[in-house]
Amino acid sequence: MKVIKTRNVQQALPEALYQLSFEGVRRDSRNGPVFMFPEPVTTVYLRPAERVLFWAERDANPFFHLMESLWMLGGRNDVEYVARFVDRMRSYSDDGLTFHGAYGFRWRQHFFEDQLPKIIAALKENRDDRRQVLSMWDADADLGRQGKDLPCNLQAIFQIACDGRLDMTVTNRSNDLIWGAYGANAVHFSYLHEYVARSVGVEQGIYRQVSANFHAYEEVLNKVAPLADLAANPMTGTETPDPYAAGIAEPYPLMSTDPEEWNQELMMFLSEPDAVGFRDPFFRRVAIPMMKAHKAFKQTSNPSRFDAALAELDNVAATDWKLAGVEWIERRRAAFEARKARAMDDGVAYE
């Protein structure tokens, strides 16, 4: 068992790529050749709330990661909501309408009851409880199924540690370290972790993800491989560039109001993001302006759409999401201007 113990996802990705460059074994897979670690890998996040990835080489979509996390906490499985942020998500659905293995739906509806309130109530009643397991894998529905979407993450185990904080351990059968573990999973599951911790009334502790198969697809790996050179080196004292460690970015609390009220506001946000009356600062100062920024960016008929999106991002109180959003928009502005310049050089009109 390999253990990658790290402060946050920003530092985890270069470290894993560095170790994979020495230990990776090339192997075929259902979706093309991969380089994989020859043994299971556990990632230990000491500060899981530092969940945002800033590497330009990875180009993580902060709007998608944030909104998909809320979609999961809302127990949804519909394609349409997440496809507005990443259209290719439709290709992972068997029927174009729902996702078979949607994590949030598994948490809150698939097993005919909402698992999260039961786990929260049990931990509030007994802080020494070791039986609180959130299930995602369903042997009846998943074992032997030949579909596009099966849960990769199988269970999340919640226990209050000796220091009084809530720790979470997630088990995973097959994990793409670039797109899954150190991208989407770091956001989705750290928000699940924080949601349960705040609902119980304790601080968020350590998040561990145990991946039985930890790999990177060769084609994608080649694009981000240079990040391995930025892994921390204790021998030389070199540290990984990290906006969190530099004090440029910091997490923003997911929940500041009563959990029941927060849940109601989550449902309202998912169905009516333009509604008024949100009380929790997370919705008013993070989720809503992030949603508005993405909506402005998608107005392709507006020649000022990049500036409009950045103006909305000025209202985001979460410095980590704000920074990631600004950088993501600016990368797209730069690409747009480059294409426009090439079109002018070729003597053609650009639209």
UniProtKB/Swiss-Prot annotation:
Keywords: Host-virus interaction, Inhibition of host innate immune response by virus, Methyltransferase, Restriction-modification system evasion by virus, Transferase, Viral immunoevasion
Keyword Transport belongs to the record: no
SUPFAM superfamilies: Thymidylate synthase/dCMP hydroxymethylase
EC number: 2.1.2.-
Highest taxon in the source lineage: Viruses
Reaction equations catalysed: dUMP + (6R)-5,10-methylene-5,6,7,8-tetrahydrofolate + H2O = 5-hydroxymethyl-dUMP + (6S)-5,6,7,8-tetrahydrofolate
A GO molecular-function annotation: thymidylate synthase activity
Disulfide topology: none
Gene Ontology biological process: dTMP biosynthetic process; methylation; symbiont-mediated evasion of host restriction-modification system; symbiont-mediated suppression of host innate immune response
Sections of the chain in a coiled coil: none
Similarity remark: Belongs to the thymidylate synthase family.
Main function: Catalyzes formation of 5-hydroxymethyldeoxyuridylate (5HMdUMP) as a step in the pathway that replaces dTMP by thymidine hypermodifications in the viral genome. As a final result of the pathway of hypermodification, 5-aminoethyl-2'-deoxyuridine (5-NedU) substitutes for about 30% of thymidines in the viral DNA. These modifications probably prevent degradation of viral genome by the host restriction-modification antiviral defense system.
PANTHER family reported in the protein's UniProt record: THYMIDYLATE SYNTHASE 1
Protein's recorded name: Deoxyuridylate hydroxymethyltransferase
